[in-house]
């Protein structure tokens, strides 16, 4: 099958048992056969932290200067002037109780949820829906803020969230397969630099243990 042949061809382009520099890894990713759509390139960073401990949980946002290549859809919980400003800034979904009702009904057709502080009592009731999808607004990621316009512009312009999973991995998209090597490298280094910046004081031993680049072979 053509898919099996492409897999074999790609597997011959690098040594799985050898560690590569970031430049080499980006070059390998760029050399792999592409699908008919523009695949997402993800980075998985294994960190030397214990995510079971509160003082070693890592969560935040980082600006990918080369962008993500994705059309980010934003939902904003706001009222009055803040809601008007959010619509003018290009948010796809804006509302208060009405938006909450839509989400309770199963509407989650957005990538980022932003809320003004006064809307958090309403948003907090949506934890069952938003939490498992990593869409719950949080002050640590800049998604609970009175300045919704700034947040919308940042997330549509390349800001992404990161957090450790239960295995101490951080999994973040850094661009598309169509990006140039310099753009992917810029985004990779921005993320790693941010993770180094927020290294917990309680983390002992080697902090950044392993970086892996992955082609996500599904259209987005």
Predicted regions and their residues:
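Flexible, glycine/charged-enriched surface loops at secondary-structure junctions
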Residues: 37-41, 198-210
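Long, charge-patterned amphipathic alpha-helical coiled-coil/hairpin "stalk" segments used as oligomerization
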Residues: 91-198
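Residue-level signature of catalytic and energy-coupling elements of molecular machines
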Residues: 25, 86, 131, 213
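Structural signal for hydrophobic packing residues in well-ordered secondary-structure cores
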Residues: 11-14, 18, 29-36, 51, ...
């Amino acid at each position: 099958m053509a898919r099996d042949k492409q897999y074999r061809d790609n597997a011959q382009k690098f040594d799985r048992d050898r560690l590569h520099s970031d430049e080499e890894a980006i070059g390998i990713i760029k050399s792999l056969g592409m699908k008919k759509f523009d695949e997402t390139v993800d980075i998985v960073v294994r960190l030397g932290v214990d995510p079971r401990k509160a003082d070693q949980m890592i969560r935040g946002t980082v600006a990918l200067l080369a962008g993500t290549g994705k059309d980010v859809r934003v939902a904003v919980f706001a009222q009055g002037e803040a809601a008007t400003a959010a619509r003018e800034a290009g948010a796809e979904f804006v509302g208060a109780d009405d938006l909450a009702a839509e989400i309770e009904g199963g509407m989650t057709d957005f990538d980022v949820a932003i809320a003004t502080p006064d809307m958090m009592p309403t948003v907090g009731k949506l934890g069952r829906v938003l939490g498992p999808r990593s869409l719950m607004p949080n002050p640590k990621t800049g998604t609970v803020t009175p300045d919704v316009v700034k947040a919308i512009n940042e997330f549509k312009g390349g800001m992404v969230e990161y957090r450790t999973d239960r295995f101490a991995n951080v999994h973040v998209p850094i661009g598309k397969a169509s990006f140039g090597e310099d753009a992917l490298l810029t985004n990779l280094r921005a993320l790693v630099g941010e993770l180094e910046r927020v290294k917990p004081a309680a983390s002992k031993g080697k902090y950044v243990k392993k970086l892996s680049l992955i082609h996500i072979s599904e259209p987005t």
